[in-house]
A protein has these predicted regions:
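A conserved mid-protein helix/loop that constitutes part of the nucleotide-sugar donor-binding site
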Residues: 192-197, 367-386, 404-407
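Nucleotide-activated donor-binding/catalytic signature segment of Leloir-type glycosyltransferases, i.e.
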Residues: 229-236, 410-426
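A charged, aromatic-enriched C-terminal amphipathic alpha-helix characteristic of glycosyltransferases
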Residues: 502-538
Length: 540
């Protein structure tokens, strides 16, 4: 049997003293989570023998791999001991005496994590009940708060960290050329899909990928081929302070990290000033996707850290204009390079922008996306109920996705009486099949950058109707852009879709116009080209 560790970069930083029999019983996902935990603890304690007690559960519990709980030799009653394993950092003698005990909890299976328990506290409980029983009312209040925060954020300067004046050569480095990546989590949708693409590009350029993530997750995609031969460390928080600098120092001492590329990773963003001070020759860049008015999100963090960073890559004109025109960053420091070709090759085979709906056929309206508060699937279901009441059998619906609101989506589906008209599809079915059947894709999100599904829909000859958020106006026709606020969104979406259903000739004309708009956006600089040039320079 092939050792699962041979498929990752883990062997570069630690060795297992004796592989136990139970190891072959781990799923590939669990084996890689264990790899990440062992890599972290061996790097945090080079020269010591690490003895890990490995746990798992069937319940909806996230992994615990690097946080302070790993130092406690007790655990909850619903955890099962998988076994124990010993390892030590490579490049150091095997200790003959003494051992450091850690407890690595691999968590529950990915399916159970869709039913995560609420965070503790009455506020979270009340919030969940209100959202479940009255999601539109909840959303109305949420959007009013967003409006206030947006106006406040536009009028206030964002503080910046001090500039780095380090001129020394910095600390010692290893010899293997590498890139340190920061990811949100290992769930490959949206921004993470682009992050995974860059990891493959780094490998193709001859750079070794080192990946850290900082968002709680079961990391269902950690076993994807893109992470083969990479060193992947899924952080769980809070990480003991004394381990942070040791792990980062060990990575830089073992590898020649030519650059850091941050993709939505708060932990790594906040360590950039330290990296700049200790390793000033390392280039620091990020990729930014979306403005988040409620929290500021990653754009605010990037602005705070901009004085120690070399370049910001943005995927939309909206982000470029915000950073340059409103926040005053030098234009040469902000690179616009789009993801128009990430999931669709604009020069490849695409459906003709011609409606395939025959006379008498119902119009098929689709929702494709994660079931999250941001994507607002509950709005789509209420839109479907309105259209069903108004158009009857002349319209049908597909809701394609999964996520943390899955149980609420199913409850809404039943409560609104949509079983006969709205088909629910999971992520086990191809999105391409849904888009082949659809005439219109509705994007009901309350925030986006530029959705990849907009490009995919156009490639399938599907009209896109979208809330007017982020830079969606770059690819969606003005007459198909809808208000962000939920009640105006529902009213406008209902009118637009009734019009498209009743006027097939107009729908066909709009499809041609949409293709032209998408093609114009695709003519902007491409993120693949920008990144390829960057990595080739780092590798030289």
């Amino acid at each position: 049997m092939t050792d699962p560790h041979d498929q990752t970069g883990a062997r570069r930083v630690f060795e297992i003293l004796q592989e136990p029999d139970w190891f072959s019983g781990l799923s590939p996902r669990e084996a890689r989570l264990l790899d990440g935990g062992l890599a972290f603890h061996c790097l945090a304690r080079p020269g010591e023998r690490i003895r890990a007690t490995v746990l798992r559960t069937d319940g909806p519990h996230l992994p615990s791999l690097t946080d302070h709980r790993t130092q406690r030799i007790e655990w909850a009653d619903d955890r099962r001991v998988v076994g124990t394993i010993e390892a030590h950092a490579t490049g150091t003698p095997v200790p003959t005496t003494g051992v450091v005990d850690v407890v690595l909890d691999l968590g529950g299976p990915p399916g159970s994590l869709m039913r995560l328990e609420l965070p503790p506290g009455r506020v979270h409980a009340v919030r969940s009940v209100v959202r479940g029983r009255a999601p539109v009312v909840f959303d109305v209040l949420r959007q009013l708060r967003t409006d206030r925060l947006e106006n406040r954020r536009l009028s206030r300067p964002i503080p910046r960290v001090g500039r780095a004046d380090v001129t020394s050569a910095g600390s010692s480095r290893g010899s293997t050329k590498a890139v340190l990546f920061g990811l949100h989590w290992l769930e490959l949708g949206g921004a993470e899909k682009w992050a995974a693409e860059t990891i493959g590009m780094a490998r193709a350029a001859g750079l070794f990928p080192i990946v850290v993530s900082d968002r709680p997750s079961g990391h269902p995609d950690i076993a994807r081929p893109v992470f083969d031969d990479a060193l992947v460390i899924p952080l769980t928080h809070p990480v003991p302070a004394e381990h942070e600098s040791r792990v980062l120092s060990q990575l830089f001492e073992r590898f020649d990290i030519r650059g850091v590329h941050v993709h939505h990773c708060t932990w790594l963003y906040q360590r950039l000033p330290w990296i700049r001070a200790q390793y000033p020759g390392t280039e620091l860049v990020d990729s930014l996707h979306v403005l988040e008015w409620r929290t500021g999100g990653f754009v605010d963090i990037a602005l705070r850290m901009s004085n120690v960073m070399d370049q910001h890559h943005v995927i939309s004109p909206q982000l470029r204009d915000y950073l340059v025109d409103q926040q005053g960053l030098p234009r040469e420091k902000v690179s616009l390079a789009t993801l128009a070709d990430l999931t669709v090759d604009p020069s490849g085979q695409r459906a003709e922008p011609v409606s395939t709906r025959k006379a008498g056929d119902p119009m098929t309206v689709a929702f494709v996306g994660r079931f999250t508060q941001q994507k607002r699937p509950y709005l789509f279901l209420r839109l479907a109920a309105r259209l069903r009441a108004r158009l009857g059998d002349r319209v049908r619906f597909i809701v394609h996705g999964d996520g943390e609101l899955a149980s609420e989506v199913r409850a809404d589906h039943a409560r609104l009486g949509l079983a006969g008209s709205v088909q629910l599809r999971g992520t086990d079915q191809p999105v391409a099949q849904t888009l082949d059947e659809a005439d219109v894709l509705v994007i009901s999100s309350d925030n986006e950058g530029v959705t990849l599904t907009s490009f995919e829909a156009d490639a399938h000859g599907v009209l896109v109707v979208s809330s007017d958020v982020g830079s969606q106006a770059s690819v969606v026709l003005p007459e198909l852009l809808l208000p962000r606020a939920p009640l105006p969104f529902l009213r406008a979406a209902e009118d637009v879709l009734v019009s498209l259903c009743e006027d097939a000739e107009r729908a066909a004309h709009l499809l041609v116009e949409q293709r032209g708009k998408v093609d114009a956006f695709a003519d902007l600089p491409r993120a693949r080209d920008w990144t390829r040039y960057l990595y080739e320079r780092w590798a030289s």
